[in-house]
Amino acid sequence: IRDRQCPAPEAIRAIAVDTTASTPCLVDRTCTPLSLTAGYEENPDAMFVLWKDHTAQRESEEITALCARGEINYARRSGNHYSSECFWSKVLHLLRGSERLRRDAWAVVELCDWIPAVLTGCRAMEDLRSGLCAAGSKVMWAEEWGGYPPEEFFAGLDPVLLPILRRLPVRTYGCDTPAGTLSPEWAAKLGLSEQVVIGVGNVDCHSGAVGAGICHGTVVLNLGTSACYMAVMPPEKMGDRMVEGIFGQVDGSILPGMVGFEAGMSAFGDVYAWFKRLLCWPLREVLLPVSYTHLRAHETCADL
C-alpha cells in the first residue's frame, strides 16, 4: 500500500479528513504526540484516547457539577452535562494520573486537528487551525462566552489544566475552511502537488451528515459503534433557545451558517457486539472446546 501511487495525481485538488471525537492526545512543543517520543512508546496515556473511552467518569461528574454551580453553565450547549467522552474530562484524568505527563505535555490536540497539521507541516500550536465542530461540541468552545471558559473556571476545577488551556488556539474554523496546503514532505510521499489544499478537520458523524445531504427539516442518523442523530436549524429560528438533552448544540457546526444539533447513543454497535458474545458464550466455552477435544482424540488414535 505504501508503494501505490495515484494514477492521476493532478486530479486531486484537495484533501479533508474527519475523525472520531473527542480523541485527544498529549503533544510536545512540536505538536508531536508523546507516544512518538523517546520513553513513551508503550504508554497508552501518551497515545490518542479513543472517543468511547469512559475512564474519566469522575472528572466528567466534577465538570458537570462545577458548570451547574456557575453563573454561566458552560455545559448548557451539551444538555447541561459534560461527558466522560469529551476533551476536558479525558485530559484532566490523564494529567492527574502522572506527574511525568504533566511535565512533558506541552499541549493537547484533537485527532481531527492533528492530521491536517501533519499534512500541512504545522509544528506549533499557535499555527494550528482548530476545527469548530470538535471544539464546539467536545471542548466547550462557544462564541457567546468568548471561546473557551475563562481561566477562573479551570482554576476552580483543577489548576493542572491551565497550561493546556492557555496553549489552545483561541480561534476556530469551520470545515469549509482550508487549513493550508500539502507540505513538501507529504507531497513527495504521496506523489501529489504542493498546491493540494488541506481542509480543516471535522468530526466523523458531522461529515457523514453532510454526505447524506443534511439540510433544515431533515434528521440524519449515523449508525455504527455508536448511533448519532443530527439536525441543523437556521440561527434566526432558534434565537437563544437551548434544547434540553442535546449532546451538542453548536453554532456553525455540521453546516456553516446553521446551528448544528448532535445526540444519540454512545453504545449502539458495541451493544450488539456484546449481545452476540453473550449468546455465543455456550458455543465458545462449551461446544467448541468439546468438539476440538473430540477431534484431537480422533487424530491421536489415527497416529497410534
Segments from the language model and where they lie:
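Catalytic phosphate/nucleotide-handling subdomain of diverse soluble enzymes
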Residues: 203-281
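N-terminal glycine/serine-rich phosphate-binding loop of ATP-dependent small-molecule kinases
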Residues: 2-37, 41, 104, 163, ...
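Short coil/turn connectors at secondary-structure junctions
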Residues: 45-47, 103-106, 167-169, 193-196, ...
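Conserved small/polar residues in nucleotide/adenosyl-binding loops
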Residues: 1, 293-300
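Glycine-rich phosphate-binding loop plus the immediately following alpha-helix
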Residues: 47-93, 97, 141-147, 250-292
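Short acidic-glycine loop/turn motifs at beta-strand connectors
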Residues: 27-31, 119-122, 232-236, 255
